[in-house]
Amino acid sequence: MNSRTVWHFAYGSNMNRAQMLSRAGKILEEHNASLPNYEVRFNKKVRGGTAGANIQPSSGKTVHGVLYKIEEGAMRSLDRYEGVPEHYRRIEVQVTPEGGQTVPAQIYIASRIEKGLRPSPNYLQAILDGAGEHNLPASYIGELKTAAGAA
């Protein structure tokens, strides 16, 4: 049986490989990648009044993250975990893997945003661990800390 696959671009805690495996079950491929003209914001309200990661358009900025190739069923599992459509909506964007050609990928964008939020220390650490695990640029990791109010 030949399952259909999809590319998913992770920019938050799903960059953490162990977490992504626990949610998707299986990763077929993974690559560092970038999404131009967007930036990460911590403006998605989650339980406890803390912030979840979100992205929004921002000319000249770049979001670095991890591009995962997964089966469609795994994407549906992620949708359930992320709370689509109540908490996040899934859209398609064009991302560029390191050293590769641009590909269409699925991402999550917060359905509702709120200003003045900060991520919990554990959540931020999961993001930073994933960024470090994939050797994302140190300057970008600094941008994540600044966006989280932790710099």
Language model feature labels by segment:
Residues 1-151:
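Glycine-aromatic micro-motifs
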